[in-house]
Structure formats: C-alpha cells, structure tokens
C-alpha cells in the first residue's frame, strides 16, 4: 500500500511539473500573439 501511495505521489509531482511547463508555454504563446497583434495593428494604421 505504501509503495502504491509513493508511486501516486511521484506521478502527481510529475503532473504538477508538466502543468507548470504547459502554463509557461501558454504564457509565451500569448505574449507572441500579443506582439503579433500589436505589429498587425501598427501596420494597419500606417
């Protein structure tokens, strides 16, 4: 039972790291989209 519990803890820890990594990636994608939007807007008004 304890071994299984330890396995579950490890899996949850890895999942947490994956979620943080995914969140960081999404944040970077959003920044890129914002920059592209600003560029497109600047091109539109010039």
UniProtKB/Swiss-Prot annotation:
InterPro entries: DegQ. Pfam families: DegQ (PF08181). Signal peptide: none annotated. It comes from the Bacteria. GO terms for biological process: positive regulation of single-species biofilm formation. Stimulates the phosphotransfer from phospho-DegS to DegU. Affects protease and levansucrose production. Belongs to the DegQ family. This is Degradation enzyme regulation protein DegQ. The lineage of its organism: Bacteria, Bacillati, Bacillota, Bacilli, Bacillales.
